[in-house]
Amino acid sequence: PGYIKGYPPGVRENGGQYTHAGLWMAMAMARKGDGERAVQLLRMLNPIEHARDAESVWHYGVEPYVMAADVYRLPGRIGQGGWSWYTGAASWMYRAWVEEVLGLQVRNGRMLLNPVIPVTWQGFSLSYRHGETVYAIQVENPDGCERGVVWVEMDGQRVTGDVISLERGLVKHRVVVRMG
């Protein structure tokens, strides 16, 4: 039923890699606390993984710097990308990495920091700009946890919970997040 029936088996939503669904799966893994699996899936979906050498790029058949909507499983075309430039998957990839894995969520003038990362990551840093205000964020993971925030500091002061009220002004804040 529907348009999927028009695709041969192994093409697009009919048994191939449907990138939107793969990204939503990665987001679900992060939300359940499985940072290892979330990052594994995101790396699999990354188009650059199809461009490790000239032969791979040629076989992939679409731009390796653009998210493809799908990757075929059709015999004779296995691993070829399709529908690049026509997909909203890039925005989902961005949200999956930033909001779900790195844990930076901005809502209603507040910034929530709740990373879900592989246990092998000792931490990471990122910068977030809100108007003219810059938040230099350092996440520390000394115990090798996949999730869980022990404390958050902004400019050397502990923050209650893991939420920071955003402000506007020509200022730079240093934020430290300790996982554990």
Question: What residue ranges belong to the model's regions?
Answer:
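Non-catalytic C-terminal accessory modules of carbohydrate-active enzymes
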Residues: 6-17, 23-180
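Glycine-rich phosphate/pyrophosphate-binding loop
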Residues: 1-3
